[in-house]
From Swiss-Prot:
It comes from Actinobacillus pleuropneumoniae serotype 5b (strain L20). PANTHER family: 39S RIBOSOMAL PROTEIN L18, MITOCHONDRIAL, LARGE RIBOSOMAL SUBUNIT PROTEIN UL18M. Keywords: Ribonucleoprotein, Ribosomal protein, RNA-binding, rRNA-binding. This is Large ribosomal subunit protein uL18. Part of the 50S ribosomal subunit; part of the 5S rRNA/L5/L18/L25 subcomplex. Contacts the 5S and 23S rRNAs. CDD domains: Ribosomal_L18_L5e (cd00432). It comes from the Bacteria. It holds the Pfam family Ribosomal_L18p.
Length: 117
């Protein structure tokens, strides 16, 4: 089993538990150059809010899109968009990534912006 398969297995297990609980999820995906965050409905079929470093709005605010500063901007923006749609509480789905570095910074920024998890 390689590193990617192990991460996907961890993510699948966590998503199964969140789906059983019927929780709205804040899903994070990271690549070496970008980070993506989506708020997904409990049934898993609808994206309610999203933000990523691919967006022009965020690219204008940060110097480089693959660092912690960019992750903080994405976390704040996705939280603001979720709160604007009336979503206040979510379950944090880290997609099998370690809760460390950019993933942790994104989560902290979303919490500071008012999202509860």
């Amino acid at each position: 089993m390689d590193k990617k398969v192990a991460r996907i297995r961890r993510a699948t297990r966590a998503r199964h538990l969140m789906r059983e609980q019927g929780a709205t999820r804040l899903v994070v995906h990271r690549t070496p150059r970008h980070i993506y965050a989506q708020v997904i409905a409990p049934n898993g079929s609808e994206v309610l809010a999203a933000a990523s470093t691919v967006e022009k709005v965020i690219k204008e605010q940060v110097k480089y899109t693959g660092n912690k500063d960019a992750a903080a901007v994405v976390g704040k923006l996705v939280a603001e968009r979720a709160l604007a749609k009336g979503i206040q509480a979510v379950a944090f789905d880290r997609s099998g990534f370690k809760y460390h570095g950019r993933v942790q910074v994104l989560a902290d920024a979303a919490r500071e912006a008012g999202l509860q998890f």
